[in-house]
Amino acid sequence: MKIYKLQTPVNAILENIAADKSISHRFAIFSLLTQEENKAQNYLLAQDTLNTLEIIKNLGAKIEQKDSCVKIIPPKEILSPNCILDCGNSGTAMRLMIGFLAGISGFFVLSGDKYLNNRPMRRISKPLTQIGARIYGRNEANLAPLCIEGQNLKAFNYKSEISSAQVKTAMILSAFRANNVCAFSEISLSRNHSENMLKAMKAPIRVSNDGLSLEISPLKKPLKAQNIIIPNDPSSAFYFALAAIILPKSQIILKNILLNPTRIEAYKILQKMGAKLEMTITQNDFETIGEIRVESSKLNGIEVKDNIAWLIDEAPALAIAFALAKGKSSLINAKELRVKESDRIAVMVENLKLCGVEARELDDGFEIEGGCELKSSKIKSYGDHRIAMSFAILGLLCGIEIDDSDCIKTSFPNFIEILSNLGARIDY
């Protein structure tokens, strides 16, 4: 894909940002904990979340879909499928399904694409194995494909050494099948969509005031079925917020955006850098929803070291903001970036250098000198949708060619369409 420099300002109201990926995955998987029809409007129709629907279909669920309205009727009993459960590129789908299936009677095989099958799964498989799960795979069940033989699970008191909503949710799902009350805690607060959704479904889960500790009881009855409207994804919206900031005389209003406090940290970073950015809450249901208004702004350098789990998906796009800011910026305490869809630390630094930016790898982040003269270049996405979309936005300033841009479809299928509608010239 080649993106040409955009010569005109942008002034737009965007209501068609991709639906939230985290909530879409959870809606589909959590429907298996109910016994009645579940309904979601504005379900994300991207490769990752469509794969999740296919997985639960192979486990016995019936699915009706009309455009982005999805109805799921769960099976009376989870089937042991005669096929591999394909998670595609989604670490969320694989890790949550490991936790869900560990306590289900049956034999299950989870696999993904070449990128997912090289991402670490021991953070899930190890604690589950310790409570009786049988999980087999390469490198001591660290790499998919993974085989899961469902077992009766023991109660646990698990203290996670990493802040990960995927680990947390996998352990919650396994706790529902354990033989007694379970406890989970993490070192810092990760995304809390699972807790919010499960509480709305009347799950037997208690959350401490600081959100760091959970008490989960085994399920004694099916959970309440869901009927929700999924808000738009703040991580996907972030690319267009960034576009409004870096393009002269531009303004973008982003509508129906999820404003969960654990998902807007990157926007707060932009505000601290000097961005003219306002967030307004319009609705409070099981999640906080609102709009984001962004205008062209001059940015200043910044050091980012806190709440990293809350901006891990936006880090590549933040690196673009760093490159366009005045002065030096850095992101640290972000070693998790090395085990995402790509090694995002190495890949961002490599590609920024190709575009004329002074950038340096740190063990747990990167350091970027802003204000360098940009040059048009060809960059590699390494199959990482967030790398591809971040450099697509930079391409609006300097022109850019992106290798393997099809990965964008895993999370944001209409990204190119929106970019084109804003006036960008794209050879795709």
Curated annotation (Swiss-Prot):
Its main location: cytoplasm. It is found in: Cytoplasm. GO terms for molecular function: 3-phosphoshikimate 1-carboxyvinyltransferase activity. Pathway: Metabolic intermediate biosynthesis; chorismate biosynthesis; chorismate from D-erythrose 4-phosphate and phosphoenolpyruvate: step 6/7. One of its GO terms (cellular component) is cytoplasm. 3-phosphoshikimate binds at K21, S22, R26, S164, Q166, D313, K340. Phosphoenolpyruvate binds at K21, G91, R119, Q166, R344, R386. It catalyses: 3-phosphoshikimate + phosphoenolpyruvate = 5-O-(1-carboxyvinyl)-3-phosphoshikimate + phosphate. It is an enzyme of class 2 (transferase). InterPro entries: Enolpyruvate_Tfrase_dom, Enolpyruvate_Tfrase_sf, EPSP_synthase, EPSP_synthase_CS, RNA3'P_cycl/enolpyr_Trfase_a/b. Belongs to the EPSP synthase family. Monomer. Catalyzes the transfer of the enolpyruvyl moiety of phosphoenolpyruvate (PEP) to the 5-hydroxyl of shikimate-3-phosphate (S3P) to produce enolpyruvyl shikimate-3-phosphate and inorganic phosphate. This is 3-phosphoshikimate 1-carboxyvinyltransferase. It comes from Campylobacter jejuni subsp. jejuni serotype O:6 (strain 81116 / NCTC 11828). The gene is aroA.
